[in-house]
Amino acid sequence: PSEYFAKYVFNRQKMYKYLPSDVYEKLIDVIDNGTRLDRSIADAVAAGMKLWAEENGVTHYTHWFQPLTEGTAEKHDAFVEHDGKGGMIEEFSGKLLVQQEPDASSFPNGGIRNTFEARGYSAWDPTSPVFIIDDTLCIPTIFISYTGEALDYKAPLLRSLHTLSEAATEVCHYFYPQVKKVQTNLGWEQEYFLVDESLYSARPDLMLTGRTLMGHDSAKNQQMDDHYFGTIPERVQAFMKDLEIQALELGIPCKTRHNEVAPNQFELAPIYEECNLAVDHNMLLMSLMKRVAHKHSFRVLLHEKPFAGVNGSGKHNNWSLCTDTG
């Protein structure tokens, strides 16, 4: 796994290779210390990203954000512009990397704005690395209204992590004056059900809502306690292996897989990561699970209670604080 881990992620190793040394150092300072992004380096960063992306067959880019829909959103744009001579050239500027203006009128907003106030802004989050899905360069971003209100889950999370670091650092100074910041770590556990695609297609309630709304208990539920940590079925294990390979290529550090308590319920858990990155990886993994499951003639159910009479799927969040001194 270490050979292909983060193969499609513009991580620090890729940054060091594709960026000028002074640009690399400034960008690392932004990531590690939260300093303000210098717009003067944006063009150089964008050029490095584009070069790496094109070497991996990428033709499009997108600002990848998390609106209030319990999923992710993206709009793909090609790396093409007119060259002024009747032809086209590939182009990706720092301006396109740092900020875009997607239409925000049709996203949930909690009633804080009118529908006709359509403008929204997506802004690059440098602390979460850029990655490649198929032929698209995905740039993690926050999503806000033109008046500054958050229209996503990432912006409030980043604000809370900053506030928590400041408060925790003040406490640490009573004991360790050398502490400069406190990082929040997160290890999530993704539980899910797998259903054969043919059986899924026979249930309109599953197709429309992702859970059962009618029917009765199956002949055997979880009374025998024989599914938890049991032998993983061969077909399910093939799905898990495929999922883990693709997840590792996207930098998601998958660690544990096993049968859960309910029949056809399973779990995947990663190694702890910085909280913002861990949340991005969980959102990415849930999207990836659906794609890989379809390839193996499964449908994955992520609803917290898809079946009555058996355990639901929780998402335990193992949360901790860590100082910059270790």
Each predicted region: which residue ranges?
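Catalytic pocket of metal/acid-base enzymes, prominently hydrolases
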Residues: 1-24, 119-139
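Alpha-helical protein-protein interaction elements
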Residues: 2, 56-57, 184, 258
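Histidine/acidic residue-rich metal-binding segments in metalloenzymes
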Residues: 3-94, 98-114
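Glycine-rich, acidic/polar active-site loops that bind/position phosphate-bearing ligands
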Residues: 118-303, 307-326
